[in-house]
UniProtKB/Swiss-Prot annotation:
Protein name in UniProt: Very-long-chain 3-oxooacyl-coA reductase let-767
Gene Ontology CC entries for this record: apical cortex; endoplasmic reticulum
InterPro entries the record matches: NAD(P)-bd_dom_sf (IPR036291), Sc_DH/Rdtase_CS (IPR020904), SDR_fam (IPR002347)
Chain's role: Required for branched chain fatty acid synthesis. Catalyzes the reduction of the 3-ketoacyl-CoA intermediate that is formed in each cycle of fatty acid elongation. Very long-chain fatty acids (VLCFAs) serve as precursors for ceramide and sphingolipids. May also be required for sterol hormone production.
Source organism (scientific name): Caenorhabditis briggsae
Domain of life of the organism encoding this protein: Eukaryota
A GO molecular-function descriptor: very-long-chain 3-oxoacyl-CoA reductase activity
Annotated active site: 202
Chain positions recorded as substrate binding sites: 189
GO biological process, one term: estrogen metabolic process
Length: 316
């Protein structure tokens, strides 16, 4: 009898766990993308300026345009001043009623003095939104000792993917804390959700972004500051090397609009409904099967990249 009661109880617990998982999946997919209305971002930010790093290409540039569309002044940060000037011109042509400032910074420079100078420039304005977007990936997937670009590339990936969200957040948070308002968006990657073979350093550094952001949410949960992780899958950008959009692959502008609509409604999400759907489905697959699928995809990507590299070498 006791054994029977235990089995019945265990069955109810298992059923409750399955029901909770299903509800969580539907909540993650439908909540921020269908059911919940976007918040008043300007009110949540508490200030009129938005800082965006890596803002001259891809997702970062799209965030800059979308924030400008929503009436924010934008402070764009990237490595090359000429590209910053061109991006500034493009933004002002489309949104002439806002202000755009630029700051050139090479994020491979890990020196604290460099960050102090950059933060001194940025903190001259009241920053309501900080989008830590700048990032670096592999040229193509490979095992650690064969990564294209070698030690230098690995060092740059580690530096660029981890230091900016850490140090810029630390340097801009004081004014947000003083106002008890502000939004920080740390752009990671869905590569952080898995231990991805052939992407070791990229996957690991994006996991750092995810953990850092989650811990910052705990540290500042009573300060009126919204701190969000965005972990996209494939977006048609220069870094992803994907040119064509599809149902699962939005362009940067579509993605940025969707992602900003989730601020305040989800603290950790992919930023796009079909990305979230993919992530939730992948999460249901046993780890050993998921790892095999992802590794096979990466091996295929590497093979295609090496064939292209060989063709280009022969053409020279």
């Amino acid at each position: 009898m006791a054994c029977q009661c235990f089995l019945v109880g265990a069955g109810y617990v298992a059923l409750a766990a399955v029901a909770y998982r299903i509800l969580t999946i539907f909540s993650n997919i439908l909540g921020p993308y269908v059911l919940l209305s976007p918040i008043d971002l300007k009110k949540r930010a508490g200030a009129s300026w938005a800082v965006i790093t890596g803002a001259t290409d891809g997702i970062g540039k799209a965030y800059a345009f979308e924030l400008a569309r929503r009436g924010f002044n934008v402070f764009i940060v990237s490595r090359t001043q000429s590209k910053l000037d061109e991006t500034k011109k493009e933004i002002l042509e489309k949104y002439p009623n806002i202000e755009v400032r630029t700051a050139a910074y090479d994020f491979t420079n890990a020196a604290p003095s460099g960050y102090k100078n950059l933060l001194e420039t940025l903190n001259k304005v009241e920053i309501g939104v900080l989008v830590n977007n700048v990032g670096l990936s592999y040229e193509y997937p490979d095992v650690l000792h064969k990564v294209d670009g070698g030690i230098e590339r690995l060092a740059n990936i580690t530096t660029i993917n981890t230091l900016p969200p850490t140090l810029l957040s630390a340097g801009i948070l004081p004014q947000m804390v003083a106002r008890k308002a502000g939004v920080i968006v740390n752009v990671g990657s869905s590569a952080s959700a898995n231990q991805m073979a052939l992407w070791a350093v990229y996957s690991a550094t994006k996991k750092y972004v995810s953990w850092l952001t989650a811990i910052l949410r705990k540290e500042y949960e009573h300060q009126g500051i919204t701190i969000q992780t965005i972990a996209p899958m494939m977006v048609a950008t220069k870094m992803s090397k994907v040119k064509r959009t599809s149902f699962f692959t939005p362009d940067g502008a579509t993605f940025a609009k969707s992602a900003l609509n989730t601020v305040g409604n989800s603290s950790d999400t992919t930023g796009y409904i079909t990305h979230q759907l993919q992530l939730e489905v992948m999460d249901l697959i046993p780890t050993f099967i998921r790892d095999k699928i992802l590794t096979n995809m990466s091996v295929g990507t590497r093979a295609a990249a090496l064939r292209k590299k060989e063709r280009e070498a022969k053409a020279q």
